[in-house]
Amino acid sequence: NSLVKDPTKIEVLGYVCTVDGNVVNTLDYNLINPRLVTKKKSRAKLVLVCGTSMNSGKSMAAAACCWALSNMGYTVNASKVTGTASLKDILSMNDAGADKYLDFTYLGYPSTYKLSEDKMLDVFNKIDLKYANDPKKFWVVELADGILQRETAMLLAHEDVRSRIHKLIFCSYDAFGAIGGLQVLKEKFELTPDAISGVCSSSPLHMKELSEFSNIPIFNSADANLDFMKEILLSKKKRSKLAFQS
C-alpha cells in the first residue's frame, strides 16, 4: 500500500543449523502425518469460507459456523488452508467450539505464498485426510485473502476441492464487493454460495442492497442467529444456480 511506509530492512547474518551442520527447515518438522493415503467416499461435511479480500470478515464468519454447529451438538474441526501464519484465526475457531484446529504451519509452511498447485493440493488433502474422515462431523475451512488471490483461486478452481464443498460461505466488506464477488464465483469457478456474511452483514444498509440484488441468505456473523444458521448449514438443498434477482 502506497500509504504505508516501507517495512524495516534486515540483513541475514546466517542460518540456524543442527549439531550436524544442516540448515534447520520448518518443513522437516511436519506435524501432520495422516494414517490414510486414500480418502473414504463418505467424509466430514466441508463448510468452506472465502471472501473478497483481507479483512472482509472471513475469520469471524468461520468462527460463527463453528459456534453454531457445536451448539447444535456436532463435532467440528477447523482449519485455515491458505495465507500467512496467524494463530489467532484458528484459535478463534477453537474458542467458538471447534474441537481440533490447525493450519498450513502444521505442515511446516510459514506461508502458502507462491506454493505450486501440487503443494497446495497436498496441504488441503493432508489436512482433509487427518481431520475430516468422520461423516458425522463437520470441517470448517477458511481460505485467506480474496478469491482472486493466487493460492486461494488455485484451490477454488480445482475439482477435488469444489467437489468436497457441503456449504459455501462468501464474505465481503461491503454490498458492492459482494455483488462483484458473486459474479466472479459463478463465472470463474462455477460456484454459488449458500450464504453471504462478513463485515457487510453488520450493516442494515448493505444487507438491504444485497437482498435487492441477490436471493442468497445473509447471516450476521457478529450476532449469529442459531435457528437461521441451522437452516443454512444443515439444509440438504443444493446451491441455486440463480444467485441474482431478476
Residues covered by each model-derived region:
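Short gly/pro-enriched beta-turn/loop segments at secondary-structure junctions
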Residues: 42-44, 74, 88, 96, ...
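Walker A (P-loop) phosphate-binding motif
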Residues: 29-84
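A short secondary-structure junction signal
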Residues: 59-63, 89-90, 152-153
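Long, low-complexity, intrinsically disordered segments
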Residues: 241-246
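N-terminal phosphate/diphosphate-binding loop that engages ATP/GTP or pyrophosphate donors
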Residues: 68-112, 183-187, 205-213
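Conserved catalytic-core segment of NTP-binding enzymes
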Residues: 2-30, 83-84, 92, 117-133, ...
